[in-house]
Amino acid sequence: MTNKISRVSKDQWLAKGLEALEAGGIEAVKVERIAKVLGISRSGFYWHFKNRQELFDHLLNYWTREYTGIVTDNPDLMKLGPKKRLLASMEMIRDKHLGKFDLAMTLWAKTDSKIRKIVNAVVKMRLDYLRATFAELGFKGDELEMRARLFVCYHAWEDTVFPDLTDQQHSKLQKLRYQYLIQN
């Protein structure tokens, strides 16, 4: 009986690449290391990427799409009114741990101006989405900007700064934070 290893998808490579980035920075994102974690030979890498630099480029796109675009470009969220959209966004960010790799990306951005531009563009996507939502709620100027930035900062760093929150604590704090953000 032979154990045939199924082909590993591009997204599986990228997901493991993000985990490697989180665990050890950009120097830890090595083809051989990721292949070993996936339980395959490194030759499988070349089905999806020409080289390590191409992996990095796709890694940035994957992070943007799967950890920001999933909220900001979500047609189901956009159908909701602004209050429900804000709450649903909070829940999605927490449930899917969408801020999980933000620290790793921020640290990588400090070492490379190209990466910094992409990370800044992702932050802008998040802020623009939230600015539009808070504007729909009637906020303007500094009140709008403070809410958008507070939301982005808290949700991007919650898993890093408060990793031991229980579900009950998180739920209680999320309700309070939501009420705080929508009150005039």
Protein language model features and the residues they cover:
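N-terminal intrinsically disordered/low-complexity leader segments
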Residues: 1-8
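Short alpha-helical elements of helix-turn-helix
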Residues: 11, 15, 100-103
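Helix-turn-helix
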Residues: 12, 16, 20-54, 58
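Solvent-exposed, amphipathic alpha-helical segments
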Residues: 16-24, 66, 70-74, 105, ...
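Alpha-helical DNA-contacting segments of helix-turn-helix folds
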Residues: 21, 56-63, 70, 118-119
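Hydrophobic alpha-helical connector segments
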Residues: 58, 72-99, 147-151
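Amphipathic alpha-helical packing segments from all-alpha helical-bundle domains
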Residues: 68, 95-104, 113-138, 146-149
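Hydrophobic/aromatic-rich alpha-helical bundle segments in the mid-to-C-terminal region
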Residues: 116-120, 135-184
